[in-house]
Amino acid sequence: MEKYVVMGNPIEHSQSPFIHQLFSKQSGIDYEYGRLLVPLGEFDKVATQFFSQGGRGANVTVPFKEDAFRFVDKLTQRAQACGAVNTILKLDDGTLLGDNTDGQGLILDLARLDFIIPGKILSVLVIGAGGATRGILLPLLNYNCDITLTNRTVEKAQQLAQEFSQFGTIRASAPQNVTDKHYDLIINASSSSMTDDIPPIPDSAYGFKTACYDLYYKAGMTSFLYHALKNGSTRLSDGLGMLVGQAAYAVELWYERVPDINPTINILRENLNK
């Protein structure tokens, strides 16, 4: 049986083994998937040992995505663009291919929710300029989204916008200068909801037709989504579906098929709300 793991620190609360257990049952692909705690500063050592002992693939979570980027032998375009790897496949020749499925997982969930529509150019506001944002920009730009990127430290947003401008239409703005208009989609990729804070953007950015998506998820509504609801937005979602979506695209890298994410999302949501 082929062996896969999720590597991180901490790792005990990772949902990945449960998600892949559900995917395995759904697809009929029999593979072993576990957790692997990696001591800080020892990613290369642990990863080398895992793959030398027969491991075929891995997911990588915080804080090792940049370590994985440097560790692998080859990179997909999306991994190269975002400078981080969350999925690894050992190829037949023994080399390691690094991918980043976070952004594609987001696209899959946004499409499931009808927050994005094929062929339509959407006006998208992305809040935050950290690693989470870096992982989602290329897939959004490939989907012809017109992106405004905002961040408390506007210089970080400007640097990121310049870096990704070769892939599509993207600009940076200070939060207080975000254009007073209703965006088609607002994505909170900042850490504000982790501390129950609200992103410092004008309330006028929200609207009845504005879809709002928080990369963070928890039982109940995040602070960002609650604030969006109070300001007229009714199409709301947290990032649980993105978590499942990025796992589904890891399966695609490993087995060339994408599992249906809906049943797994429903089960995880039920467990989360218990």
UniProtKB/Swiss-Prot annotation:
<feature type="binding site">
    <location>
        <position position="86"/>
    </location>
    <ligand>
        <name>shikimate</name>
    </ligand>
</feature>
<keyword id="KW-0560">Oxidoreductase</keyword>
<dbReference type="GO" id="GO:0009423">
    <property type="term" value="P:chorismate biosynthetic process"/>
</dbReference>
<dbReference type="GO" id="GO:0050661">
    <property type="term" value="F:NADP binding"/>
</dbReference>
<dbReference type="InterPro" id="IPR041121">
    <property type="entry name" value="SDH_C"/>
</dbReference>
<comment type="similarity">
    <text>Belongs to the shikimate dehydrogenase family.</text>
</comment>
<dbReference type="Pfam" id="PF08501">
    <property type="entry name" value="Shikimate_dh_N"/>
</dbReference>
<feature type="binding site">
    <location>
        <begin position="14"/>
        <end position="16"/>
    </location>
    <ligand>
        <name>shikimate</name>
    </ligand>
</feature>
<dbReference type="GO" id="GO:0008652">
    <property type="term" value="P:amino acid biosynthetic process"/>
</dbReference>
<protein>
    <recommendedName>
        <fullName>Shikimate dehydrogenase (NADP(+))</fullName>
        <ecNumber>1.1.1.25</ecNumber>
    </recommendedName>
</protein>
<feature type="binding site">
    <location>
        <position position="217"/>
    </location>
    <ligand>
        <name>shikimate</name>
    </ligand>
</feature>
<dbReference type="InterPro" id="IPR022893">
    <property type="entry name" value="Shikimate_DH_fam"/>
</dbReference>
<dbReference type="InterPro" id="IPR011342">
    <property type="entry name" value="Shikimate_DH"/>
</dbReference>
<feature type="binding site">
    <location>
        <position position="61"/>
    </location>
    <ligand>
        <name>shikimate</name>
    </ligand>
</feature>
<dbReference type="GO" id="GO:0019632">
    <property type="term" value="P:shikimate metabolic process"/>
</dbReference>
<feature type="binding site">
    <location>
        <position position="215"/>
    </location>
    <ligand>
        <name>NADP(+)</name>
    </ligand>
</feature>
<dbReference type="InterPro" id="IPR006151">
    <property type="entry name" value="Shikm_DH/Glu-tRNA_Rdtase"/>
</dbReference>
<dbReference type="GO" id="GO:0004764">
    <property type="term" value="F:shikimate 3-dehydrogenase (NADP+) activity"/>
</dbReference>
<comment type="function">
    <text>Involved in the biosynthesis of the chorismate, which leads to the biosynthesis of aromatic amino acids. Catalyzes the reversible NADPH linked reduction of 3-dehydroshikimate (DHSA) to yield shikimate (SA).</text>
</comment>
<comment type="subunit">
    <text>Homodimer.</text>
</comment>
<dbReference type="InterPro" id="IPR046346">
    <property type="entry name" value="Aminoacid_DH-like_N_sf"/>
</dbReference>
<feature type="binding site">
    <location>
        <position position="102"/>
    </location>
    <ligand>
        <name>shikimate</name>
    </ligand>
</feature>
<dbReference type="InterPro" id="IPR036291">
    <property type="entry name" value="NAD(P)-bd_dom_sf"/>
</dbReference>
<dbReference type="GO" id="GO:0009073">
    <property type="term" value="P:aromatic amino acid family biosynthetic process"/>
</dbReference>
<keyword id="KW-0521">NADP</keyword>
<feature type="binding site">
    <location>
        <begin position="151"/>
        <end position="156"/>
    </location>
    <ligand>
        <name>NADP(+)</name>
    </ligand>
</feature>
<feature type="binding site">
    <location>
        <begin position="128"/>
        <end position="132"/>
    </location>
    <ligand>
        <name>NADP(+)</name>
    </ligand>
</feature>
<comment type="pathway">
    <text>Metabolic intermediate biosynthesis; chorismate biosynthesis; chorismate from D-erythrose 4-phosphate and phosphoenolpyruvate: step 4/7.</text>
</comment>
<dbReference type="Pfam" id="PF01488">
    <property type="entry name" value="Shikimate_DH"/>
</dbReference>
<keyword id="KW-0028">Amino-acid biosynthesis</keyword>
<dbReference type="GO" id="GO:0005829">
    <property type="term" value="C:cytosol"/>
</dbReference>
<dbReference type="InterPro" id="IPR013708">
    <property type="entry name" value="Shikimate_DH-bd_N"/>
</dbReference>
<dbReference type="Pfam" id="PF18317">
    <property type="entry name" value="SDH_C"/>
</dbReference>
<feature type="active site" description="Proton acceptor">
    <location>
        <position position="65"/>
    </location>
</feature>
<feature type="binding site">
    <location>
        <position position="239"/>
    </location>
    <ligand>
        <name>NADP(+)</name>
    </ligand>
</feature>
<keyword id="KW-0057">Aromatic amino acid biosynthesis</keyword>
